[in-house]
Amino acid sequence: MSKDLISTDEYIKIKKKRKRIKKIVVLFIFLISILVTLCLKIPYFNIESIEIKGNVNIPKEVIKDSSTIKTGNNIFYTNKKDAIENISLNPYIEEVKITKKLPNKLQIYVKEREALFYNKVDNDFFIISKNGCVLEKRKEIKNMKLINLQGFEFNESKIGSALKAKDERAVKILNDFGVLLKNNTSDVIFTQLDLRNLLDIKIYYNGICVKIGTSDQIEKKLNTAINILKRDELKKAKKGYVDVSYEGNPVFYIEK
């Protein structure tokens, strides 16, 4: 009988303990709810500043406006996913990151695509990034220092999307060239890239045609060509060719 009394006492203690825990949990949830409500309501968490970083050509106000985030909005109500999608609609934007800095600051970091190529179709110039994204169509390209690009279906390509090509390899090859040309620090400035025949790729330096051949070892071929084009006898040449398309010593010819 004493055993039954002990077990009953223990049961009562356990039950009381559970009730206490339940009350504590309810109180904790209640306090959290109050805290969340305060965070969403009090002006302390209203956005006071929106900082834009990483932009080069796109004005800060354009990025800020396209995000649809306003100063005065509660920082916890801010929908980062929607803001990133809105900013990314600009073809010149390659990457967006948004960071909330409590209590009231927002930082938007963007990485821009850089214009490197162009092609003229009728009266419009297609502006192309180094990795083959169509950035825009415009009526003039004065002072933009772009490289003429051949070998793609420009009329079938959409702004904000990759160039259309009959051969899908062309976009990959263009991207490889884009990286190398963007990193070219020499005074050899190429004027045209011809990818119409991927077995006979050509790139031009003023009137001199550089025969690349296939896309194998593009970096090596391009560096070899640049070193040749830097020679004094080729700097003033108006017409000729440099052939680096095969293994062995390259050949060059200057038309007199």
Swiss-Prot record:
Bilayer topology: Single-pass type II membrane protein
Keywords: Cell cycle, Cell division, Cell membrane, Membrane, Transmembrane, Transmembrane helix
GO terms classed as biological process: FtsZ-dependent cytokinesis
Location of this chain's protein in the cell: Cell membrane
Transmembrane segments: 24-44
Pfam families listed in its UniProt record: FtsQ_DivIB_C, POTRA_1
Stretches assigned to the Cytoplasmic side: 1-23
Database matches in Gene3D superfamilies: membrane protein fhac (3.10.20.310)
Domain POTRA positions: 45-113
Extracellular side: 45-256
CC per GO annotation: cell division site; plasma membrane
Family affiliation: Belongs to the FtsQ/DivIB family. DivIB subfamily.
Annotated function: Cell division protein that may be involved in stabilizing or promoting the assembly of the division complex.
Annotated HAMAP family: DivIB
The protein's name: Cell division protein DivIB
Organism, scientific name: Clostridium botulinum (strain Hall / ATCC 3502 / NCTC 13319 / Type A)
